Amino acid sequence: MESTQVIDWDAEEEEETELSSGSLGYSVEPIGQLRLFSGTHGPERDFPLYLGKNVVGRSPDCSVALPFPSISKQHAVIEISAWNKAPILQDCGSLNGTQIVKPPRVLPPGVSHRLRDQELILFADFPCQYHRLDVPPPLVPRSLLTIEKTPRIRIESQNSRVLLAADSEEEGDFPSGRCVANGQRNTASPSATVVPESDEEVSSPAPSVPGPSSPFGLGSDTDEEQGQQPGVEESSLADSSGAAGEAEQPEANGTTAGIQAQPTEHKLKDTKVKKEAGRAGVSDGSVLERSPTLGEDSDTEVDEDHKPGFADSETDVEEERIPVTPPVAPVKKNQVLLAVGIGDPEAPGVAHLQDCLAGSGTDVEDKTALDVPLERNHTPMVINSDTDEEEEEEEEVSAALTLAHLKERGIGLWSRDPGAEEVKSQPQVLVEQSQSASGRDSDTDVEEESSGRKREIIPDSPMDVDEALTVTQPESQPPRRPNDADEYMDMSSPGSHLVVNQASFAVVGKTRAQVEEEVPGPSVILGEKHQVPLEGAQPPEEAWETAVQEGSSSPEAAASVRPSQQPVAEDAGTECATAVSEQESTLEVRSQSGSPAAPVEQVVIHTDTSGDPTLPQREGAQTPTGREREAHVGRTKSAKECCDAEPEDLCLPATQCFVEGESQHPEAVQSLENEPTQLFPCTLPQEPGPSHLSLQTPGADTLDVPWEVLATQPFCLREQSETSELHEAHGSQPSLPREPPGHQHLVHTSPVHTELLRIEGREIQTVEKAMGIPKEMADRMTPEREPLEREIRGRTENSERDVIGEELIQGTKDREPKKVLARDSQRKEADKDLEGNRESLEVEIEMSKDSQKRERKVEKPEPKREWEPADLEVTPDRGVTEEGSHDQKGQIASLTLKPGVGVKDLEGLASAPIITGSQADGGKGDPLSPGRQQRGRLSCQTTPAGKASRGDPEPPDHCLFSSVPEASTQSLLTSQSQKQSTPQPLFSTSSSEIPLPESLHTKPNVRPRRSSRMTPSPHSSAALKPNTTCPTNQPAASRPTSRPTRGRANRSSTRTPELIVPVDPELQPSTSTEQPVIPKLTSQVTEGRVQMPEPLLTGPEIQSPTSTEQSVTPDRKPRATRGRPSKSPNKTPEPLISTGPELQPPTSIEQPVIPKPTSRVTRGRPRKSSVRTPESVVSTGPELQPLTSIEQPVIPEPRATRGRPSKSSIKTPESVVPTGPELQPLTSAKQPVTPNLTSRASRGRSSKSIRTPEPVVQTGPEFHPSTSTEQPDTREPSSQARTRRSAVKTPEASVPTTPELQPFTSKKQPAPKPTALVTQGRTYKPSTEDCESVGPVAPDFEPSTSTDHLVTPKVTDQSLTLQSSPLSASPVSSTPDLKPPVPIAQPVTPEPIPQANHQRKRRAAGKQGSRTVPLGHKSYSALSEPEPQSSASQSSGASEADSPRQKRPRRQASQKTVVIKEEPVETEVKEEPQETAIPTPEKRKRDHAEEVTQGKPTRSRRTKPNQETAPKVLFTGVMDSRGERAVLALGGSLASSVNEASHLVTDRIRRTVKFLCALGKGIPILSLNWLYQSRKAGCFLPPDDYLVTDPEQEKNFSFSLRDSLCRARERRLLEDYEIHVTPGVQPPPPQMGEIISCCGGTFLPSMPHSYKLHRVIITCTEDLPRCAIPSRLGLPLLSPEFLLTGVLKQEATPEAFVLSNLEMSST
């Protein structure tokens, strides 16, 4: 990269000398600072950098003294020749080397590297970030600024200097990672005017060239990032710039920056300056202002430095609000503005801003080939702009709230997003900010889309025009109807829409979600109104599409369209906006990536949606596009109908689609940011994150995630994540989804992005627009959806599985398509991108996503999360899609009804929360997306029937939406869900989800959205809960946690969403009549798993009756449960699920409850809770959620564990998948699910996400409470199919287990269940086969299965979110409870039982591992019960035992009984006695058989029974991936510290801090053989036989480990001791303090000044002079060996370790 290069010192010396001489006088003040990120070494620190040479090294006399062993005495030198010159970094021949993080590069000694602002540097293993301080010297700065040469020379350093470069810079920052630095720097930058920007820009290499720098910079940045095509970027940039300039400001970047700056000047001086400096500069500026906050995020997301920067920037902008616009406006934004101005004279400000934002994003995208830079830049800008204007216009209050949210959440988002993927982050941020701006922004975007579609964004730029043309093609569809146009636009416009909208929309979407939470109605309304008029000016479809296609305008157009729809449904609008925002963000990012091509691609995506790709990629997407277009048209029509019935709905779906995209986008974006070239792929991943994330995940809160997210969850992110991978998988899958345009939306979306799907279904938005997309998709796809779905189904099924191989490759494409699916646009863009550089990017993104998802939380986590989320996401997507497809066919009638409004609205609602989740998790959103996708598909299908069935759905949806912000919304949603049950399938879940989200969302959204990614995640979780469940799971898996949380959350999100989708819809349809009951159930289930079920027609059928029946039971319980979510919830959830239907009206209640719990849980421990809750929620839906709440705390742990388990989680999903598919097949209705499953299976990872949903689906359908649950289960498995093992297995295990397990698990669920899940995930691989077995069983069992499924979903969820798992189980339990009501299942029981057994085994296995005993028990119990049926028993027994217990005992009894029962089955021996009561023999046999079949059954049940909770294993002194996998496969989790660990694994006795702490606490210290043997046995074996043996060390220290452990358990060694450790002691005082605390002593941080018995000072000879006071007081001065040796021997003998007077005197 240009960053690191040998410098021609001769040529530069003169210049530098000159500069330095001029600036030497300023050496007094630091020119920059080097930030050392916090870590095990200590807190974060900033070192000032002055003119001249700043030596970095271990020596105390170094300017930057890093006193760490791995740092050489003189490690490196940072030379600053002049204040405005880029510092030169040189390695001084250090031992461990100096590395540039972005792009990764080791700096050879003697080679100079120009440091860019915010650039990340790795000194040995210590990550640092260079920040340029904006302290422009009076003279030098200007001269330097004047000197083009310098800027050029310091391409990276001085990018900011060049105004044009600024644009590039932003892009550059993205790739370079300057973003982080920029964020911080930018703050200063504002004051510095151009120079600071210059600096910031400087940080971006691209901007080095002043004039061309903008385009060049973009290219350059891109280059830096991924070596994208600068030419393209330039042309794209130029185009965008030109267009923007023409419309807004003739001048390109500079002018644009200026103009934009003017509006935002007051708020965003930085932005302005930055803008002036360049787009990147502007973004940076925005970021900078928020830099401190963002900076941290940035720091956190060091990996995604630039991206974080962007994210930061976005956040900043959003926070600043005004800055938002300006930053967005700078280059692309300006262009966008231009487009807006042209397109939207009516609402010039908002439209303009939005356009700027969206357009800018698009423009930037168009303008710059560098997707990443632009994306990043763009996204933030979009958010800001949109948010800014719209918020201002909409409501200052809203704005304030949004801002607060944004800040809260933005920051969280930032951290996650940037971490997950900077690009993603940015989109997420955008979304988040947008959401923050809330509905406004999103509204604006949406409105703009509405208007924007009318907006004639065509003028934007040639590219834009091109896009417009492309759009026009889709426009042929627009004729369908304005609304249709909107919807279509959504689909059609998705490409450009995605492109622009993604960036813009990401903002909008997030904002919308946020606003929705904050002020759902108003924001949306305002934005919508505002924008609608703008957009309205032009023909809705045409203008809109044109705008969308235009690229710059495109996003806005897309947003516009959506808003247009949104106007109809304000809440939906908000949601829509959010979706749009997200999508826009994604698109924008993508567009940016695509640059000219990208815009076209975006357009293509739109076109794809339209059915007419502009670009080859588009063409690639085109095929799907045609179909998609059809689907879109169908959808659009459906949407239109809905729209007619309820424009809001339509809007929502469309918007939501976008949101999903956004979610995806953020993650993707972030991912892209990480990899400029791979911008698009990243963007796709971003969908999740979650998702991502985290929607972006990650998440957005997963925001995760994740970025991915958290992801996004990315994005997700982090989660997506989780989302990214899903996206990717989906992306691969896209081939599957891609095939049918309509489908593509759904399917693709799902593949692309579970989130996307959701997006399409609005799932993304909601939770993942859980409903939105379905609605839109359903609407549009409904007509052709069936065919498409069939096609897709077949295709998806085959495709999904086949695609798995292809997936990565196609994944990139597919992912894009998925995104597009989410937003056709997005998909298109993805396709285009994909084709452009998607594949590599996709792969990278997938990895990135994985990473990002985890990363969303932290870059590291992000990757895991990213791919996991992606996987999850993809899986859900695919699974959902497939399932949805199949199911949809069946349910199309039902679903369709709802899609229009219900889905959309719900989705919108869900979406908002989801977005949050998505953002947080990146993955979160995504997860929902998949569900939503399914839902969307379902929705479409259901729509007709649903519509017919529920004529109300739309209105309810609206109401729902309106209420969304509030619990009432949830209620409405629920109601709606019920009403629009069919549609709601998508929606129902959504509903559930949405209510959750709404309530959660609303509540938490505001708070969590920004507040914390995690929180949002939880909210998302809550909101997503069903969704989030997935997201959570996903996050757990990856999404995000999208970012971790993000990734995990994302993933969970994805998964959950899927679950949710099916459940809700199915239940909902069923519930139509019983709606209240079923919906709730559905909600729950939906949330949990009904989603999937929804696809299962059976589900609904059964569901109605069952639902009612069960519903009632659960209803009560759920409430009770709700009251005491934890235990009760377990039980309750069971009832709850049943109740779901009943509750569904209650769903709203339940949902509220869930949201509450979720909220609570989520809020309380947003991330974990989120994850867990969502899972719980998913299964139980509302009930579960409460449960989750309660359990969530536990779950969170797993969650944490999940951070790593994430993978496990993912795996689990895989296992699940088989089950899913089989289960799915079992459920005829579920069969669609099966495809999903398959898809998922193919997806593998995606599976995770999907997985939960899958189980849910199955269960859902089966039960619909039961079926629903089952279907979800199936679906989940489906989803999980991707993550086949876990999913399948989990579902199976889950299914059987769940019923009983759930109750049982409920209580213990947190620990055990998740473990089981994880284990299942892993274990499930074998399970797959079982799953299949189970599959058949499930159908037989249908109700039973449903329960099983439910369980599975739960398990799956759990798998995804280990922690969540328990909750999941709970829901499952619920199902069982329901099941008793539905003895139907009992007959089936036998088959299901095996299934259950399998699942149980798996689950148990999984759980045993983590939760070990409890889970096992639960799992087994549940399984067992279900198995022998225990079905009957369960039903009966559960009924009897559970009946009474059902409410609570059920859980308890169930747990116990279940545990016992199940355990016997699985454990056969252990639980046999207990299980005997319940058809133990039969069950056991079955179980056994299944277990045998699965091969892992053993492990699950037994261990769990043995251990109440899954072991939390900590490793010390060994890095053993095999052992870690064994832990996760067995359902255990990986502890991050001794405090949470239940077992320590090492290879020998060593006096490490962890070892001594564990010994002090009496924790078993085991050898690796324990894990290996446990893995073989399928459960965690008793630890006593596997204690570490090290005779040599025991001899050396004269102690026996076994004896010491016994003594430590009997009594803590230092119980009465108060100990102070002086600073010079080794290990250092903090670690000694940890040992002291673990041994029961009290650590005194400061020197004591009084005497007390057993108060001692641990010191060393060097510190003896410090000990004069204690020495006078007579306090014993002991050597460190008192502690080190004393703990080993478990003997406290101070007198033996007193430092002698001799030593003291000598000292």
Curated annotation (Swiss-Prot):
| Positions where Phosphothreonine occurs in the chain | 4, 146, 222, 300, 315, 362, 387, 444, 470, 1056, 1132, 1173, 1234, 1297-1298, 1352, 1375, 1480
| Glycyl lysine isopeptide (Lys-Gly) (interchain with G-Cter in SUMO1) crosslink, residue number(s) | 1461
Phosphoserine PTM positions? 168, 176, 198, 220, 298, 313, 360, 385, 398, 415, 425, 438, 442, 461, 492-493, 591, 593, 595, 735, 750, 885, 929, 962, 991, 1104, 1126, 1128, 1327, 1359, 1435-1436, 1439, 1443
Q: Name all BRCT domain ranges.
A: 1510-1588, 1609-1700
Q: Which residue ranges does the record annotate as region Interaction with CHEK2?
A: 1-150
Q: Give yes or no: UniProt keyword Zinc-finger.
A: no
CDD domains per UniProt: BRCT_MDC1_rpt1, BRCT_MDC1_rpt2, FHA_MDC1
Q: Which Gene Ontology cellular-component terms appear in the entry?
A: chromosome; nucleus; site of double-strand break
- Taxonomically, the superkingdom here is Eukaryota
Residue stretches of biased makeup (Acidic residues): 9-18, 386-397
Q: Name all FHA domain ranges.
A: 54-105
Location of N6-acetyllysine modifications: 769, 1496
Q: Name one Pfam family in it.
A: RTT107_BRCT_5
The biological process GO terms on file are: DNA repair; DNA replication checkpoint signaling; protein localization to site of double-strand break
Q: Where is the composition biased (Basic and acidic residues)?
A: 264-278, 369-378, 626-642, 719-730, 778-804, 812-868, 875-889, 1459-1473, 1481-1493
Q: Region (Interaction with the MRN complex): which ranges?
A: 2-222
Compositionally biased intervals (Pro residues): 1378-1393
Which key words are in the record? Acetylation, Cell cycle, Chromosome, Coiled coil, DNA damage, DNA repair, Isopeptide bond, Nucleus, Phosphoprotein, Repeat, Ubl conjugation
State the protein's purpose. Histone reader protein required for checkpoint-mediated cell cycle arrest in response to DNA damage within both the S phase and G2/M phases of the cell cycle. Specifically recognizes and binds histone H2AX phosphorylated at 'Ser-139', a marker of DNA damage, serving as a scaffold for the recruitment of DNA repair and signal transduction proteins to discrete foci of DNA damage sites. Also required for downstream events subsequent to the recruitment of these proteins. These include phosphorylation and activation of the ATM, CHEK1 and CHEK2 kinases, and stabilization of TP53/p53 and apoptosis.
What quaternary arrangement does the UniProt entry report? Homodimer. Interacts with H2AX, which requires phosphorylation of H2AX on 'Ser-139'. Interacts with the MRN complex, composed of MRE11, RAD50, and NBN. Interacts with CHEK2, which requires ATM-mediated phosphorylation of 'Thr-68' within the FHA domain of CHEK2. Interacts constitutively with the BRCA1-BARD1 complex, SMC1A and TP53BP1. Interacts with ATM and FANCD2, and these interactions are reduced upon DNA damage. Also interacts with the PRKDC complex, composed of XRCC6/KU70, XRCC5/KU80 and PRKDC/XRCC7.
- Name assigned to this protein: Mediator of DNA damage checkpoint protein 1
